[in-house]
Amino acid sequence: KRKDLYTHAFIIFACAHYWAKVREPLVESVLDAALAVVAERFATGDGLYEAVLERNWSSLKSGPLQNPLMHLAEGFLATLAVREDAITQDALLDLATALQKRFIDRQHGVMMEKPLGAVDNWFEPGHQFEWFFLLDSSEVLRGTPLHASLTRAFAYAELKGVDKLSGAVSGMLALDGSVRDGTQRIWAQAEYLRALTLRPGSEAVLQRQLLALQQNFLHEKGWHECLDAKGAVSRRDMPSTTPYHLATCYQGLIQHLG
């Protein structure tokens, strides 16, 4: 019953894409309402947003978290792709500035999962790749300090979090690059593959990752959600969050391959 920023971010994302297709006023009104709720209820006044609120919209003092903020940025970008919207563009740029200040490790440029200084913090290679794609493919965000950071983060995440032989992407890393969770998740594989389409000189790696996704994760009845660190299937259900990652990955590949 709690109010999640993650959910509202995807409402914005979905409405923007749907409105682009149908141009129905009702759809745009839902988009506007979702944007207003985020601005009025979740915003903390410093460019960031609470990750979760109580069911009555009161604060839980949970603070901001990386993942819902990334999907909010994605929702803002989807909105700007279908209409001119100065308020949303300002919110997006303020978010990017605040993330650079509060979430980016200065040494490696990586986007941490929790704000800098939080206890038991970590970073996920998959999220570095996902952020890189969003930033590098956006005219609004390309060239910002956050874009420069995630360009560095891509290289560090690739070095420490991707197996050069199998193409496996590790789940969670400590800041020093040591593996905290070696679980291979299909969404991280898809995000790495999509991000590679924007990296010059990555054709050989792109082909390797395409094969790795096909051979290790996809099968005739769907997909393997997770493999363990040794490559054995560790999760057999197929959650509804995954097709979004696969669809956006395939879309990126289609644009890259023409």
Q: What is each residue range found by the language model?
A:
Residues 1-258:
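Glycan-recognition and catalytic cores of secretory/periplasmic carbohydrate-active enzymes
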